[in-house]
A protein has these predicted regions:
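C-terminal boundary and immediately downstream tail of ABC-type ATPase nucleotide-binding domains
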Residues: 2-4, 8, 248, 252-273
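ABC family nucleotide-binding domain
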Residues: 28-253
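ABC-family P-loop ATPase nucleotide-binding domain
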Residues: 1-39, 273
Length: 273
C-alpha cells in the first residue's frame, strides 16, 4: 500500500550521529530538538539536573538508566507533559515556553507512545486512529481512513480495524498506539518504555515494529531497557542517573567500553539476565 502522507522532505534524512562519553550534550549537524541546562523539580526532589542534549533529524536515540533516574521526566518535558523549571527546550527552533507556537510545533512534529496504551476504550480502532487527523488536522474522513488502513498494515494488524481496544492483546494495543501516532505524520517519535507493561511473549512483536520504523529513517527517542533493541537500531545510547546524563556514546562503545563506573554497574546488572 502506498504511503498516503505527503513526502517528508527532511524527517527521513539521517543526521550525523555524534558520540560522546560523560558529556551533557551530543551535537552534530543541526539539532531538531535541543535541550540546554534543563532542570526539573518535583517539590524538593530534583528530577532533571542541568541536562543538555541535541537530537538531529533521522537519529535514533535510546535512553536507559535505573528507576527514578529522570528518563521519563526528560521525555515528558520534551513533549510538554511536564514543564521544566530552568533551562531551555526547543523543537525545530521554537522554544517550548512560547505558548501557541510551542503547541503548534508539538502537534505538527511530535508523536508519543506511552507505557500504557492510552487508547479510547469506547472508540473502535479505526476511530482511535482517525480522531486526531480529522479533529486536529481537518483531514477529510475518507483520507483519514486511508491513513488508518495504511498504518495498521504497517504494524501488521489490518484485520483489527473495526474492533475495540478490549478485544485486542496488549501487544496489539501498543501497535495501534504506534499507528495512531504515525497517522499524525510526526517528524519525531517519542517512546516512554513502550514494552514495560507487556507480557514477555508480546514484547518482540512491538520491538519488531519499532525496528522497522527505525529502518524507514524516522527520528526516534526511546526510553527503554531493551538493550538488544538499542544495540540494533540506536545511533546513540544515553545512560541517566540521579537526573543527569552520565554517559553517552555509539552502541558499540557504550556496551563494550563504558567509561563511567555508574554505567558499568548498570550494564553489569541489566545484561546479567
Amino acid at each position: 500500500m502506498r504511503d498516503p502522507h505527503p513526502a517528508r522532505s527532511s524527517a527521513n534524512s539521517p543526521a550525523n550521529s555524534p558520540a560522546g562519553t560523560g558529556g551533557m550534550s551530543g551535537g552534530g549537524g543541526t539539532a531538531f530538538i535541543s535541550l540546554r541546562n534543563v532542570d526539573k523539580y518535583f517539590g524538593d526532589f530534583q528530577a532533571l539536573d542541568d541536562v543538555s542534549l541535541d537530537i538531529g533529524l533521522g537519529q535514533k536515540i535510546v535512553i536507559c538508566g535505573p528507576s527514578g533516574s529522570g528518563k521519563s521526566t526528560l521525555i515528558r518535558c520534551i513533549n510538554r507533559l511536564e514543564t521544566h523549571d530552568q533551562g531551555a527546550i526547543s523543537i525545530d527552533g521554537v522554544a517550548l515556553d512560547d505558548g501557541a507556537a510551542a503547541r503548534a510545533v508539538l502537534r505538527n512534529n511530535v508523536g508519543m507512545v506511552f507505557q500504557q496504551f492510552n487508547l479510547f476504550p469506547h472508540l473502535s480502532i479505526l476511530e482511535n486512529l482517525t480522531l486526531g487527523p480529522v479533529r486536529a488536522r481537518g483531514l477529510d474522513p475518507q483520507k483519514a481512513r486511508e491513513l488508518a488502513e495504511y498504518y495498521l498494515e504497517r504494524v501488521k494488524i489490518p484485520e483489527q480495524i473495526d474492533k475495540y481496544p478490549h478485544q485486542l492483546s496488549g501487544g496489539q494495543q501498543q501497535r495501534v498506539a504506534i499507528a495512531r501516532s504515525l497517522c499524525m505524520n510526526p517528524k519525531i517519535m517519542l517512546f516512554d518504555e513502550p514494552t514495560s507493561a507487556l507480557d514477555p511473549e508480546m514484547i518482540s512483536e512491538v520491538l519488531d515494529v519499532m525496528v522497522e520504523l527505525a529502518e524507514t529513517g524516522m527520528t526516534m527517542l526511546c526510553v527503554t531497557h531493551e538493550m538488544g533493541f538499542a544495540k540494533r537500531v540506536a545511533d546513540r545510547v544515553i545512560f541517566m542517573d540521579f537526573g543527569e546524563i552520565v554517559e553517552q556514546n555509539v552502541p558499540e562503545e557504550f556496551f563494550n567500553n563504558p567509561k563511567q563506573d555508574r554505567t558499568q554497574l548498570f550494564l553489569s546488572q541489566i545484561l546479567a539476565h
